[in-house]
Amino acid sequence: MTGCCTVLGAFLFEYDTPRIVLIRSRKVGLMNRTVQLLILAYVIGWVFVWEKGYQETDSVVSSVTVKAKGVTMTNTSKLGFRIWDVADYVIPAQEENSVFIMTNMVITMNQTQGLCPEIPGKTTVCETDANCTAGSAGTHSSGVATGRCVSFNGTLKTCEVAAWCPVEDDTEVPKPAFLKAAENFTLLVKNNIWYPKFNFSKRNILPNITTAYLKTCIYDAKTDPFCPIFRLGKIVESAGHSFQDIAIEGGIMGIQIKWNCNLDRAASFCLPRYSFRRLDTRDLAHNVSPGYNFRFAKYYSDLKGAEHRTLIKAYGIRFDIIVFGKAGKFDIIPTMINIGSGLALLGVATVLCDVIVLYCMKKRYYYREKKYKYVEDYEQGLGNQMEQ
């Protein structure tokens, strides 16, 4: 109990104040200056020069529009001679911050609603009607089973379904890609950015770009780094992939536009930087459900009014435009905050040197005596002197 009272009394009735002691030691002095120099180098070099700690920052607000250009032709036994332009291979016509270019397809023509044999599979091949369950519709079924086992070809029978007939057969994807010439199609990317905190706006079609230049330029990282027109093959190649390979089963490519702007400089120095990467992960060792595809249909009616459709399973490349960046401009508040933080960090040198001097050096007990001085209360000390 007495010990607790002593500790409590010491806490309540004692006061400590810093005492300046000048220690003439080469080791301690050199260490102190070294730590101070390191802190100054960090504050000046990293905080102010590299991280621009004297600036207020803002994130980019962006809008993007994409326009595709290019035309090609095909001549096949199924479709005959055909010209393909933007309205044929850009599906849908407009998307938010992205565009889909169809490069390959499986076409099932002249479908009508009726009864027909299902495509052969583990659950659809049959020998008798007993092998088929009427009314069943599996996840991968083309229609609803009727319960009948019918001839698929001369040697094979499958369960009959009520569906759009003939049903689609997508077991084999065309190789090479149906629209392999899409490698030379181009994308015009128009990007407008805005930093609301600074009321600063700009677009990637720079002021020095003329109409004549825009009609002839194609983006190249070395010769035309600010041309907003990109060749599809070059985009895929820059991401480290082969266009003809990805065109077969499709994929997702990212066009990244980086806007990092120092608004303490002229607006002409605020420029877009382009980079490219494939966004859908492709694992060759586990190549399950690769690529990118979807289905759509074109409907029409014959002279008798019967509804028909052409079903297209479209494989292609979706180009996502990803815009990011930040802008900075001088502001007194972050400047003063970082200066104050830097000055506070200088105190670390004193604390570190105190620890070395008072607890690690051979003469630590001597330095402790010089560092700390115990003084009694003035009135109590005066009373003790009078008694003596």
UniProtKB/Swiss-Prot annotation:
**Record's subunit section:** Functional P2RXs are organized as homomeric and heteromeric trimers. Forms heterotrimer with P2RX1. Interacts with P2RX7 (via C-terminus); this interaction is functional only in the presence of ATP. Forms heterotrimer with P2RX4; functional differences between homomeric P2RX4 and P2RX4/6 heterotrimer are minor. Interacts with AP1M2.
- Give glycosylation sites per the record: N75, N110, N131, N153, N184, N199, N208
State one molecular function term (GO).
Answer: cadherin binding
Give the originating organism. Bos taurus
Q: Which UniProt keywords apply?
A: ATP-binding, Cell membrane, Disulfide bond, Glycoprotein, Ion channel, Ion transport, Ligand-gated ion channel, Lysosome, Membrane, Nucleotide-binding, Receptor, Transmembrane, Transmembrane helix, Transport
* Residues given in the record as CTP binding sites: K67, K69, T186, N293, R295, K313
What is the name of this protein? Answer: P2X purinoceptor 4
- One Pfam family of this protein, by short name? P2X_receptor
Instruction: Please tell me where ATP binds in this chain.
Output: K67, K69, T186, L188, N293, R295, K313
Q: Which GO terms describe its biological process?
A: apoptotic signaling pathway; calcium ion transmembrane transport; cellular response to ATP; cellular response to zinc ion; membrane depolarization; monoatomic ion transmembrane transport; negative regulation of cardiac muscle hypertrophy; positive regulation of blood vessel endothelial cell migration
> Membrane side Extracellular: which residues?
55-338
Which superkingdom, per the lineage? Eukaryota
Transmembrane intervals = 34-54, 339-359
UniProt catalytic activity: K(+)(in) = K(+)(out); Na(+)(in) = Na(+)(out); Ca(2+)(in) = Ca(2+)(out)
Which GO terms of the cellular component aspect does the record hold? lysosomal membrane; perinuclear region of cytoplasm; plasma membrane; postsynapse
Stated family: Belongs to the P2X receptor family.
- Tell me the disulfide pairings in this chain: C116-C165, C126-C149, C132-C159, C217-C227, C261-C270
Cellular localization per UniProt: Cell membrane; Lysosome membrane
Side of membrane Cytoplasmic, spans = 1-33, 360-388
Please give the function described in this protein's UniProt entry: ATP-gated nonselective transmembrane cation channel permeable to potassium, sodium and calcium. CTP, but not GTP or UTP, functions as a weak affinity agonist for P2RX4. Activated by extracellularly released ATP, it plays multiple role in immunity and central nervous system physiology. Could also function as an ATP-gated cation channel of lysosomal membranes.
Quote the record's activity regulation: Activated by ATP. pH-dependent and inhibited by acidic pH.
**How does the entry describe its membrane topology?**
Multi-pass membrane protein
